[in-house]
C-alpha cells in the first residue's frame, strides 16, 4: 500500500540561425539599412537545458468504508539558457564571403546566460467514505532563485470536496452518474530570471571602438510573487446507458493580487525605474461547460464528440490610488478589458468640427469604445476509432 518513486527528466533544446545578405541587398540588417547594401552576416545560437528531479512517497489504503490516498514528495527544478549572437558591422570586407571574420569593422557580439532553480516540498491527501464522499487537501512550498534572498519561499494550498449523489439517492435509469464538487486554492507565480538581480550590460564599439559596461537603470525592490486565489463549484452528470452522454458545468472566481509593475522613479536616485507590487486587484468570473457524447458505438467502430464552451470576464476588485488608470470607466466592479481611443469633436448638432488645417478636430479626451475579451470561446473535437 506504499511505494517510493524517483523520477528524473530533462529536455535539451538548441536553435541555430544564420542570416546572409549579399552586397546590394535592400534590407535592414542589425546595424541599419546600410548593412544590407554593403553585405551582412549574422549567426545566433540558443540552447536550453531544463532538468527536473522528484522523489515521491505514494500510499493507498482501504479501511472498511474509508479510503486513504496520497503522496509526499520533493522536487528540484533547474534550467540554464545560453544565447550567443554575432554579426558583421558596416558590411562584408569580401563580397560573397559570409563569415564573422569578414566584418569591415569590429563585429557585434552578444552573449547571455540565464539560470533558475526552484526547490519544492509538497503533499496531497484524499479521504473517501463509501465511494461517495471525498475530501482532498494539497500543500506545496517553493523556494525560487528569482525572488529576493530574504523572501524566496512561498506556500500555496488546495482544498476540495465532492459528493456523488447517484450513490445515495434513487435516480432514473437514464442518469447513471451524478457528482457535485467544490474547491478552493491559492497559486503563486515567481518572477522572471534576473528581474531583480542586476548585472552589467556590455556594449561594443561605443566610442571609437571602445567597449563600455553600464549598470542597469532599475532599482531592485522586495517583490512578492503574483498570487491567485480561486474557488470553484461544479457538477458532472452522465446520461443514457453506457454513459454515452456526459455534461460537466463549473463556475469559477479567481482573485489576482500582488501584481507587479515597473515604475519610473526620480533619476536623482541613480536609477530610472523600480519593480514593485501594487495594490490593484482583479477578479475573473466565468463559466465552463463540457459536453461529451458517443453518437455511434458498434462492435468495431465508435464516434466520440467533445464540445467545450467557456466565458469569463475580469473586473477590478481593488484600485491603487497611485497607479490605477484615471478615467470614467475604471472603478471597482468595472471590467479591465476596456478599449478606448480619442475620437473627433462634434458640435451640438452632431456635425464634425473642422480645424484650421481643414481636418477634423481630434478630441483631447479618450472615449470608451468597447471591450476586448471574447463573449464566448469554444472548441469542438471528433474522434473516430
Describe every region a protein language model picked out.
Residues 361-365:
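Short Pro/Gly-enriched beta-strand edge/turn motifs at strand-loop
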Residues 1-21, 33-335, 340, 368, ...:
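Extracellular/periplasmic, surface-exposed regions of secreted and cell-surface proteins
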Amino acid at each position: 500500500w506504499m511505494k517510493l518513486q524517483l523520477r528524473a527528466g530533462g529536455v535539451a533544446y538548441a536553435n541555430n540561425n544564420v542570416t546572409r545578405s549579399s552586397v546590394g541587398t535592400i534590407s535592414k540588417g542589425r546595424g541599419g539599412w546600410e548593412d544590407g547594401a554593403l553585405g551582412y552576416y549574422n549567426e545566433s545560437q540558443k540552447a536550453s537545458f531544463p532538468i527536473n528531479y522528484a522523489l515521491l512517497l505514494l500510499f493507498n489504503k482501504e479501511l472498511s468504508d474509508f479510503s486513504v490516498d496520497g503522496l509526499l514528495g520533493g522536487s528540484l527544478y533547474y534550467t540554464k539558457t545560453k544565447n550567443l549572437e554575432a554579426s558583421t558591422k558596416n558590411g562584408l570586407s569580401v563580397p560573397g564571403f559570409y563569415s564573422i571574420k569578414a566584418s569591415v569593422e569590429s563585429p557585434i557580439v552578444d552573449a547571455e546566460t540565464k539560470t533558475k532553480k526552484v526547490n519544492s516540498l509538497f503533499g496531497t491527501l484524499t479521504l473517501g467514505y463509501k465511494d461517495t464522499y471525498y475530501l482532498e487537501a494539497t500543500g506545496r512550498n517553493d523556494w525560487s532563485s528569482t525572488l529576493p534572498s530574504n523572501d524566496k519561499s512561498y506556500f500555496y494550498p488546495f482544498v476540495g470536496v465532492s459528493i456523488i449523489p447517484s450513490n445515495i439517492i434513487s435516480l432514473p435509469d437514464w442518469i447513471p452518474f451524478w457528482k457535485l464538487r467544490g474547491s478552493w486554492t491559492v497559486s503563486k507565480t515567481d518572477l522572471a530570471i534576473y528581474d531583480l538581480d542586476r548585472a552589467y550590460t556590455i556594449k561594443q564599439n561605443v566610442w571609437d571602438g571602445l567597449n563600455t559596461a553600464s549598470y542597469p537603470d532599475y532599482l531592485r525592490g522586495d517583490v512578492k510573487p503574483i498570487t491567485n486565489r480561486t474557488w470553484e463549484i461544479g457538477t458532472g452528470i452522465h446520461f443514457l446507458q453506457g454513459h454515452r452522454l456526459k455534461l460537466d458545468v463549473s463556475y469559477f472566481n479567481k482573485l489576482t493580487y500582488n501584481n507587479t509593475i515597473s515604475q519610473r522613479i526620480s533619476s536623482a536616485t541613480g536609477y530610472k525605474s523600480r519593480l514593485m507590487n501594487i495594490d490593484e486587484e482583479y477578479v475573473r468570473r466565468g463559466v465552463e461547460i463540457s459536453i461529451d457524447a458517443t453518437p455511434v458505438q458498434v462492435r468495431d467502430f465508435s464516434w466520440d464528440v467533445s464540445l467545450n464552451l467557456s466565458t469569463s470576464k475580469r473586473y477590478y476588485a481593488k484600485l491603487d490610488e497611485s497607479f490605477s488608470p484615471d478615467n470614467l470607466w475604471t472603478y471597482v466592479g468595472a471590467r479591465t478589458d476596456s478599449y478606448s481611443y480619442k475620437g473627433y469633436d462634434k458640435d451640438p448638432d452632431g456635425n464634425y468640427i473642422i480645424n484650421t488645417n481643414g481636418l477634423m478636430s481630434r478630441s483631447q479626451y479618450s472615449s470608451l469604445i468597447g471591450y476586448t475579451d471574447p463573449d464566448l470561446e469554444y472548441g469542438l473535437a471528433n474522434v473516430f476509432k
